[in-house]
Amino acid sequence: KIVVPALALLATAVSFSSHASVTPDRTRLVFNESDKSISVTLRNNDPTLPYLAQSWIEDAKGNKISSPLAVLPPVQRIDAMMNGQVKVQGLPDINKLPADRESVFYFNVREIPPKSNKPNTLQIALQTRIKLFWRPKALENTSMKSPWQHKVTLIRNGQDFTVNNPTPYYVIISNASAKKGGNPPAGFTPLMM
């Protein structure tokens, strides 16, 4: 009976103490079709050690891709407390993406720590994954007279809720409850639609 709580406590302590040294400057990217590329600043927050930052793009299913988007440079060294920059570049195949709705990809950064000179050291390479939305020209300039967000509906049916997103934009629902400030229902997981 003591083993399970001890393991749970250990897992909690480890999760609180682990955080990435190399982090992107935002939590999501929007790549407008009218832009040739977008830049992302990567920050090495470690006060003493340089890190390698490896970056790549994945499709909506989590498969690593090399087109229609690419990251340059794919690997770079970032010194302690310094910034690096990567460019997400559109390639010719980008014209094959739907022109009437957003497409979702994932931008990934893996930090690679320097080799330790201490014996018997476990090193962990942490990875950050953020959403990257490609937005076609038809969706770039939305009218504030009729915001697209007002078209997203929430319908209550007893204890259940149905969300309808008829728009060409992705909506992320990170939390839900039956009343303001309430707890989410058991088993609720964030979703993107």
Where does each model-flagged region fall?
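Terminal connector regions
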Residues: 93-139
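Short acidic, flexible loop segments centered on an aromatic residue
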Residues: 46-63, 167-183
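Buried hydrophobic-core signal for structured, non-transmembrane domains
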Residues: 38-44, 88, 105-110, 160-165
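Intrinsically disordered, low-complexity Pro/Gly/Ser/Thr-rich segments with frequent PxxP/GP/PP motifs
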Residues: 63-97, 181-193
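Bacterial N-terminal signal peptides that target proteins for export
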Residues: 1-7
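Extracytoplasmic
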Residues: 35-37, 50, 83, 102-104, ...
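Beta-sheet-dominated interaction scaffolds and their linkers
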Residues: 20-43, 142-156
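N-terminal signal peptide c-region/cleavage motif recognized by signal peptidases
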Residues: 12-17
